[in-house]
Amino acid sequence: MNIVVEFFVVTFKVLWAFVLAAARWLVRPKEKSVAGQVCLITGAGSGLGRLFALEFARRRALLVLWDINTQSNEETAGMVRHIYRDLEAADAAALQAGKGEEEILPPCNLQVFTYTCDVGKRENVYLTAERVRKEVGEVSVLVNNAGVVSGHHLLECPDELIERTMMVNCHAHFWTTKAFLPTMLEINHGHIVTVASSLGLFSTAGVEDYCASKFGVVGFHESLSHELKAAEKDGIKTTLVCPYLVDTGMFRGCRIRKEIEPFLPPLKPDYCVKQAMRAILTDQPMVCTPRLMYIVTFMKSILPFEAVVCMYRFLGADKCMYPFIAQRKQATNNNEAKNGI
């Protein structure tokens, strides 16, 4: 094709992409079904991972839950089984009420499987993934959610904690994707969800290791998405989830300027997951929560660095992590004193 003609074709496609994006904001797209599909969630024992598990259970997915904490993972599984029982009871009641079978969702083998896995250890991931393939089947939806935070200033943070943060928050995404992507490529079907953070799009002081891990996983996700497009594997979808501070306790103590905080409070975990689920089930490539994060990210990319610093100071975002770090340090000192260290 002549380059001039191709240029106008590309221009039209770019403008059309803007039209489609605007339409998605105005008209909610229809959600796809994940009923009967195998959905694997890392870090499922608590926080967002647990809530993701409950949301996928309500949509009749077959769940595979990974967490390093066996007890909390089993607690999540118990909640999932309770949802499954309610769904089965509702289906039975609907049949007794005389509803046609076509009005009831098709029956699925509703099961939940739990695995204790440290996603920060490559061999552990590969071995557990092999067990999943043998005991459950191939994974259709992969939700890379597991995450940790050290809570130390850079010069006070032990090297081992820095490495741990990078392994769990970033490297683990490589290992899980390498484990389950090959089959997705073979059948050209699947969905990979990357739970990152707004701190993977812009940073702040005091969490260098966490920001580096989240920036890294955002880059990984974007490159993977481009690779799938280049391979014309349009049946494999990807969704990048970048929430603002979520009130799960992970960053307890983090505070922005008190006059600003009522307008930008920590997100409720339920709200965050529901927004992410909407994006996943409508094949949205990326979701930032709240939407203000899109503007912040855009401003950061066009403003001079000193202008960004001024904005951070005005919002109280420049040292927002300091109270959180101080609380972590105090808790560590208390534990050491309690244990006689």
Swiss-Prot record:
NADP(+) binds at residues 40-64. GO terms for molecular function: all-trans-retinol dehydrogenase (NAD+) activity; all-trans-retinol dehydrogenase (NADP+) activity. Keywords: Endoplasmic reticulum, Lipid metabolism, Membrane, Microsome, NADP, Oxidoreductase, Signal-anchor, Transmembrane, Transmembrane helix. It comes from the Eukaryota. Its EC number is 1.1.1.300. Its main location: membrane. The keyword Endoplasmic reticulum applies. Belongs to the short-chain dehydrogenases/reductases (SDR) family. Retinol dehydrogenase with a clear preference for NADP. Converts all-trans-retinol to all-trans-retinal. Has no detectable activity towards 11-cis-retinol, 9-cis-retinol and 13-cis-retinol. Required for normal embryonic development. This is Retinol dehydrogenase 10. It comes from Mus musculus (Mouse).
